[in-house]
Regions:
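Short, conserved beta-strand segments of beta-strand-rich sandwich/propeller modules, principally
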Residues: 27, 111-115
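Alpha/beta-hydrolase active-site loop
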Residues: 237-268
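A domain-start/cap signature at the N-terminus of enzymes
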Residues: 95-105, 109-111, 119-176, 187-192
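Recognizes extended acidic, P/S/T-rich segments that occur
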Residues: 38-110
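Short, surface-exposed "cap/lid" segments of acyl-processing enzymes
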Residues: 163-199, 204-215
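Primarily recognizes the serine-hydrolase "nucleophile elbow" in alpha/beta-hydrolase
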Residues: 271-325
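Pro/Thr/Ser/Gly-rich low-complexity, intrinsically disordered linker/stalk tracts
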Residues: 11-35, 121-141
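The feature captures the conserved acid-bearing segment of alpha/beta-hydrolase catalytic domains
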Residues: 161-163, 308-406
Length: 408
């Protein structure tokens, strides 16, 4: 009797791994099956993972898909759009959305060796190498044709516009893959808009970050692209079970500072005429970010902002809980800067300790606003009045938030 044994070779989970170096970054692309991978880096071929550094983790299947172009990324229950890949060269063709993508920011010049491993069993499934060098990373133009010429905004005022919660800046002109300081892992993509309108350089970032899971603890969200109240989020946001061992980090502020520095160098606006404004969550960011950077902004306009995140009244501090922690935020919960989170997000305390070197502030609140608690505001205004030399304008209405129809 003859027994015939037929062995079928399993298809490789990753193939055609390529590495391209430019502008201080390495772009890794590959074809894949339904594969979750980690990325490792070393200065020699990787045979032993203990001698390499893990630089990317929790990369989901089809990481080359441009989730920014999918409405379901931002609104719970929204149907998915047609998958499209990221555009990683100025005005270039999009990647195959079924493939993989990871972007590494180079810290040391030389030949770099990369390996992809299966997240399930840490088995090396692909490797490659490339010669690369550090450099000034830059955003990628997302429109057809060529980006604006350097200096197109020379001498013009700059306006940083921060959107409200639930918002997203559609058709943004630029895409950047951040370094390890800008997110819970290296290579996270974020988009932003810069345009010259009516004699101004208008900068509109988007307060969204991909966490690879539904953000169900945020009752009004549940999407995998979360909002952060223009501050940041927990360093372990990718896994709810690990957040208690993580740290609140101002990733979003770091992204905004990078954007503004790049716009300063490329568009060349007048450094003495920078302004920041926003409504609702955008107003919150105007106070917690813009107003607290007097070296950047001459004036700020905050429409119905939270000025201090506390548990007074309806408890505005609860807005930080879903992204920064696992529940009630204790007074001693520290950020990555070693400052208690609730102190860092307390503009009343900031005014009392800073003195008078702050931007001009225009602010509007509603006493009966159902979304932004009034309880924090009187002490803030008293602190403004007590601080020498501070200038501001205050407008008040009842239920201003609802009458304007602003989400928060």
């Amino acid at each position: 009797m003859t027994i015939l044994c037929l062995i079928l070779a399993a298809a490789a989970p990753v193939s055609d791994l390529k590495a391209t170096a430019r502008d201080g970054q390495v772009f890794l692309t590959w074809k894949e099956a339904e594969t979750t991978v980690d990325v490792y880096l070393a200065s020699e071929p990787i045979a032993d993972l203990t001698k390499a550094t893990r630089i990317g983790h929790h990369l989901e299947p089809h990481s080359a898909r441009d989730w920014w172009e999918d409405p379901a990324s931002f609104k719970k229950g929204e149907p998915h759009g047609k998958p499209v890949g990221f555009r990683i060269q100025d005005g270039g063709e999009r990647l195959d959305p079924s493939g993989g993508l990871f972007v590494h920011t180079v810290r040391k010049a030389g030949k770099l060796f990369f390996a992809l491993t299966s997240a399930e069993d840490a088995r090396v499934i692909a490797s490659t190498s490339v010669v690369a060098a550090p450099g000034a990373i830059r955003p990628i133009w997302q429109r057809d044709g060529q980006p604006p010429a350097p200096g197109v905004g020379k001498g013009k005022p700059l306006w940083l516009s921060l959107h409200a919660k639930g918002g997203v800046v559609a058709n943004s002109e630029y895409l950047l893959f951040g370094d390890e300081t800008m997110g819970w892992r290296e290579g996270l993509p974020f988009k932003f808009s810069v345009s010259v309108q009516n004699g101004e350089v208008v900068v509109r970032p988007t307060d969204r970050v991909w966490i690879g899971r539904p953000h169900n603890e945020a009752g009004d969200a549940g999407t995998p692209a979360i909002w952060t109240f223009w501050f940041g989020y927990n360093s372990n946001i990718f896994d709810r079970k690990l957040m208690a061992s993580g740290t609140p980090v101002n990733y979003t502020e770091r992204r905004n500072l990078w954007i503004l520095d790049w716009v300063r160098r490329y568009y060349q606006p007048d450094p003495n005429r920078w302004y920041c404004s926003g409504s609702s969550m955008g107003g919150c960011g105007t106070v917690s970010f813009g107003w607290q950077h007097p070296e950047l902004f001459a004036a700020c306009h905050a429409h119905v902002p939270i000025v201090s995140y506390t548990y007074l009244g309806k408890g505005s501090a609860t807005r930080l809980e879903p992204s920064c922690w696992t529940g009630h935020i204790a007074p001693d919960l520290k950020t990555s800067d070693g400052v208690p989170l609730l102190d860092r997000m307390n503009a009343t305390k900031f005014v009392a300790e800073t003195g008078n070197d702050l931007p001009f502030l225009f602010m509007i609140h509603g006493r009966q606003d159902g979304s932004i608690p009034w309880e924090n505001n009187p002490s803030f205004y008293r602190a403004l009045s007590a601080a020498p030399g501070l200038r501001g304008l205050l407008g008040q209405r009842d239920s201003f938030h609802e009458r304007q129809g602003c989400p928060c």
